Design a protein with these regions (language model features):
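ATP-dependent carboxylate-amine ligase
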Residues: 1-143
């Protein structure tokens, strides 16, 4: 599932909806945008910890902000850090989540939704969660 969820409430909503489908496990790929509301980061980490089985924490338009600082903010209130994999490269995080998943599992890729760029240090790089996920899924076997 791809979703634009970028607030604690929207992340909770998509993960709760996926839980209603009775998945074996939920794998979540998400991050928080840089140079944006820092107060939502720790609550988003808490939602991810509560509602996902494994979380692949990654970049989501870091803009001019240090990505590791964003990760630190997200992880501030997390108590089960073993549920989290920190992977700054978003494509790699998506690939890892798909690689970890098996039949009956759901992978939720949240935060960017329809966006087709990744903003970093003033540069807009072409980037589409949808295209990347589709590419890996079409391979049939992820290598």
């Amino acid at each position: 599932y791809l979703d634009y969820a970028h607030t604690p409430d929207s992340l909770s909503a998509i993960l709760s909806t996926v839980q209603e489908l009775n998945p074996s496990q939920i794998f979540l790929v998400f991050g928080c945008g840089g140079d944006r509301d820092k107060t939502k980061r720790a609550p988003m980490g808490a939602v991810a910890e509560k509602l996902a089985d494994k979380v692949f924490l990654t970049s989501d338009n870091p803009r001019y902000e240090d990505q590791m600082s964003i990760f630190s903010d997200i992880m501030a209130d997390v108590t089960h850090k073993d549920k989290f994999v920190i992977e700054p490269d978003r494509e790699t995080a998506i690939r890892q989540a798909l690689l970890f998943s098996h039949e009956g599992d759901y992978v939720v890729i949240a935060g960017k939704g329809h966006e087709t760029t990744q903003s970093k240090n003033g540069i807009e790089y072409p980037f589409s969660d949808r295209a990347i996920a589709r590419n890996y899924l079409q391979l049939g076997a992820i290598v």
